[in-house]
Amino acid sequence: MSETLNLQIPSPTFEGSTGGWLRAAETEEKYAITWTSPKEQVFEMPTGGAAIMRKGENLLYLARKEQCLALGTQVKTSFKITDYKIYRIFPSGEVQYLHPKDGVFPEKVNPGRIGVGNVSHSIGKNLNPAQIKFTNKSFCD
């Protein structure tokens, strides 16, 4: 799938209601998530209820970016689908590609990305707090 949004992609089959979420999104902005499924399967909607994703490409509109991220995490962990993309759609029709911004998901490392807050050892190599409690040494050193 490319970074441009094809609005002709079919949506998953959903028999419920979004509870009015998308009504407000029509006047402000809405979000779209796309993914490719190897087969038809039932998934849980972030707004509640369940839907059936279609075999092939799927397009789903949601009102909040957090709902798209939650659904993206679900399809990645439960269904092993890793090609999802999230877009912001403004009322004017302008489409902005949001996630993953540089083509790599945030939890992965690519050559151009700088790690922030990384520790160069495993958690098993951490100091025992009881051994350094009354010394001048810090946990972070």
Swiss-Prot record:
Q: Where in the cell is it found?
A: Plastid, Chloroplast thylakoid membrane
One GO cellular-component annotation of the UniProt record comes to:
chloroplast thylakoid membrane
Chloroplast recorded as keyword: yes
Its membrane topology is listed as: Peripheral membrane protein
Report which residue ranges the record marks as coiled coil.
none
Q: Taxonomically, which superkingdom?
A: Eukaryota
What keywords is this UniProt entry annotated with?
Chloroplast, Membrane, Photosynthesis, Photosystem I, Plastid, Thylakoid
Q: Which InterPro entries match?
A: PsaD, PsaD_sf
**Gene3D superfamilies given for it?**
Photosystem I PsaD, reaction center subunit II
Give any single GO term for biological process. Answer: photosynthesis
Q: Kindly give the SUPFAM superfamilies that the UniProt entry links to this protein.
A: Photosystem I subunit PsaD
Q: What role does it play?
A: PsaD can form complexes with ferredoxin and ferredoxin-oxidoreductase in photosystem I (PS I) reaction center.
Family that this chain belongs to: Belongs to the PsaD family.
Q: What is this protein called?
A: Photosystem I reaction center subunit II
Q: What is the lineage of its organism?
A: Eukaryota, Cryptophyceae, Pyrenomonadales, Geminigeraceae, Guillardia
Gene (name only):
psaD
